């Protein structure tokens, strides 16, 4: 029941309720990002990008190996081995294509190990689960379904292979990888358009760009060293890896030349897969992210290259072996620089530096 108190004196209007927010309160409001959340966001970005890359590489390998030339087979074998998609000691595609295909297919589910496609998808789910308050319901559901559908359909494909005598179920696995790639595109779309672009989102983006720069620069450098750009199939493979096939055909119809290829994959600042775009985006977002610690942000990003200042004529110049040696060296230096940057971010910002619940930005 209500209780009314009568008094003859002045009434005290003090209230324990929070006062309404003022315009000044809203203007100064910053969302806190704890060290634990910061690390999870960073790795959510990295696992998303890593999953996209290994799914794409596995798909390209299984789709093209049987008709590929020896240089292309060798490059695909090196890239898949570097990313742990086949066990160490597996015969290369040039040594035994059948054994390599089977090892690649069997190494895709989560149970195969910490570098498998399935493990990366499971790690993506684990990071997302710790960030439920930052993800829309659709975003979270997409990530859950991605992992569940991949494991279910991959297990079905491999079980069918076992019943039929153990041959690599290439067509079935390629189909599963294609659907997984489409599902991952929906996840990255949710990250781009369904998240608030605060400091936490910028850290997620930084993680994605670090992973993208590392994987694409190394793959391109090894592809150029293997002479992939000198053949039609290798040319298409590089464009497919950078998801730039349609863009290249629209701009340079009927041309298969080194200069326009490098212009699109390395120097184009409008293509989200080009080296120049990724480096610039990584640098700008990290500096904006760490604006409260500007000296550190500039110190760790200054060693990153600036591809927009490179000379395309100089970088595309071929040496005696027909390879763009200067560009290859620059790509390897970029890989080294981005790995050092990743270590610097981890050492400076994340929970193992101090208390797990400390604020990184506020």
Where are these regions (language model features)?
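Alpha-helical transmembrane segments and their helix-helix packing motifs
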Residues: 1-362
């Amino acid at each position: 029941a209500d209780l009314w108190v009568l008094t003859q004196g002045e009434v005290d209007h003090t209230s324990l309720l929070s006062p309404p927010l003022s315009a000044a309160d809203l203007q100064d409001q910053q969302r806190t990002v704890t060290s634990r959340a910061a690390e999870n966001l960073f790795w959510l970005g990295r696992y998303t990008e890593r999953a996209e890359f290994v799914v794409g590489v596995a798909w390209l390998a299984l789709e093209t190996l049987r008709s590929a030339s020896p240089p292309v087979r060798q490059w695909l074998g090196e890239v898949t081995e570097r990313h742990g998609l086949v066990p160490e000691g597996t015969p290369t595609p040039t040594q035994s294509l059948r054994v390599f295909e089977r090892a690649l297919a069997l190494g895709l589910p989560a149970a195969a190990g910490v570098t498998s496609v399935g493990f990366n998808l499971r790690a993506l789910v684990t990071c997302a689960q710790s960030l439920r308050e930052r993800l829309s319901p659709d975003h979270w559901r997409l990530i859950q379904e991605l992992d569940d559908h991949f494991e279910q359909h991959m297990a079905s494909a491999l079980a069918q292979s076992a019943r039929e005598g153990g041959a690599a179920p290439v067509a079935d696995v390629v189909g599963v990888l294609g659907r997984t790639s489409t599902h991952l595109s929906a996840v990255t779309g949710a990250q781009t358009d369904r998240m608030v672009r605060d400091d936490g989102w910028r850290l997620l983006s930084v993680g994605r760009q670090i992973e993208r720069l590392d994987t694409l620069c190394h793959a391109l450098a090894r592809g150029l060293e293997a002479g992939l750009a000198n053949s039609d199939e290798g040319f298409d493979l590089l464009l497919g890896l950078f998801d730039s096939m349609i863009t290249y055909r629209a701009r340079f119809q009927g041309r298969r030349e080194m200069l326009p290829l490098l212009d699109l994959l390395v120097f184009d600042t409008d293509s989200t897969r080009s080296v120049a775009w990724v480096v610039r985006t990584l640098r700008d977002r990290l500096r904006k992210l760490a604006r409260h610690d500007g000296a550190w942000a500039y110190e760790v990003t200054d060693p990153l290259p600036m591809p927009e200042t490179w000379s395309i004529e100089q970088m595309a110049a071929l040496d005696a072996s027909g390879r763009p040696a200067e560009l290859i060296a620059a790509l390897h230096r970029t890989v080294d620089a981005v790995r050092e940057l990743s270590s610097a971010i981890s050492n400076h910002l994340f929970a193992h530096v101090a208390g797990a619940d400390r604020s990184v930005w506020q």
